[in-house]
Amino acid sequence: MSDSAANNILSIYRRHADAFASQRSRALFEKSWLDKFITVMGGQGSIVDIGCGNGQPIAGYFIQQGFQLTGIDGSPAMLARARHSFPAQRWLEQDMRELVLNETFDGLIAWDSFFHLTQQDQQKMFPIFDRLSHPGSALMFTSGTDNGIAMGQFEDEPLFHASLAPDEYRALLSAHGFAVVEMMMEDPHCAGHTIWLAQKTG
């Protein structure tokens, strides 16, 4: 069940883009963490939003702060909404697991997207984070609290989530040149999200 649900993630977001857009909160409860991310970046530069969805509210917040943004998503319908809202930015239809970008960014964010990958695919993302970053780049992503799989539901379909253990995330970050700046389990001020903020050191 979990393997088929993991393989169905892109299909769900492609078929239910309108439902996601209507249900996604725009309250920006993430703001304090987005501001921390900006601070680690140095307050300026380019950002890649991996799993950007329709661009609201996270990509939109960065754009309003003056950042040049590249949004990556596997749902054409969501990207169409993002392009309509922010035509001056770059929006690319790609699977994050096979991300092809021949450049580095000052900030990399995978908020509520990376955790839809299987544990094996999450492990394989760290060389991609490494390749897309340079010394000083900020990286932020959300995860679960411990090693395991959790099933949610969206539009009456099973919605796959997975997580590695915190020690494994720390080891993967370190192995690919990132130092953890801050990590918080189930932040009560951020809708219970577990958040990792790191910086490329070498």
Which residues does each PLM region occupy?
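Conserved class I S-adenosyl-L-methionine
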Residues: 1-42
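Class I SAM-dependent methyltransferase SAM/SAH-binding core
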Residues: 48, 54-98
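A conserved beta-strand element that flanks and buttresses the S-adenosyl-L-methionine
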Residues: 109-110
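A short glycine-rich, Lys/Arg-flanked "PGG" loop and its adjoining helix->strand segment in the class I
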Residues: 123-135
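Conserved beta-strand signature within the Rossmann-like core of class I S-adenosyl-L-methionine
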Residues: 136-143
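Short "lid" loop at the C-terminus of a central beta-strand within the Rossmann-like core
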Residues: 144-149
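Acceptor-substrate binding/catalytic loop of class I
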Residues: 151-167
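Core SAM-dependent methyltransferase catalytic element
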Residues: 185-202
